[in-house]
Amino acid sequence: MKLAITGATGFVGRHLLNLAVAKGHAVRALARRPQDDIDGVEWIEGAIDPAGNLDALVAGADAVIHVAGAINARDRAGFAACNIDGTAAIVTAAQDAGVKRFVHVSSLA
């Protein structure tokens, strides 16, 4: 299965990424900064926002697993920009690309 993963550089996302690769899935993962090469992973430089290269992340994906989220922000607007607007942007990109499966993981209550 071709998976697109956000938040793959965080604690939960990194474990998910490693498990997906170990299970033989092809993974495309979003990262704000360059990452070390990992066999089976294509890194897409971008961010969780409407201009964040999300179309490239989700193109051809069978499923999107959205793990990215702000757990520390300077203010309420900072949380909203990532956790609300960013989530809406990745959902829209996935819908526009015809992705049939979308999993949203969130650790904030």
How should these model regions be labeled?
Residues 2-4, 77-78:
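Short, contiguous strand/loop micro-motifs
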Residues 3-25:
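N-terminal Rossmann NAD(P)H-binding glycine-rich loop of SDR-like oxidoreductase domains
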Residues 25-32:
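Conserved glycine-rich Rossmann-like NAD(P)H-binding loop of the short-chain dehydrogenase/reductase
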Residues 35-36, 41, 45-89, 93, ...:
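NAD(P)H-binding glycine-rich loop region in Rossmannoid oxidoreductase-like domains
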Residues 96-101:
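A short helix->loop->beta-strand "cap" motif at the edges of active sites that frequently abuts
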Residues 6, 30, 64-68, 102-108:
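SDR active-site strand-loop-helix element
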Residues 3, 16-19, 30, 54, ...:
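Generic leucine side-chain signal with a strong bias for well-ordered alpha-helical environments
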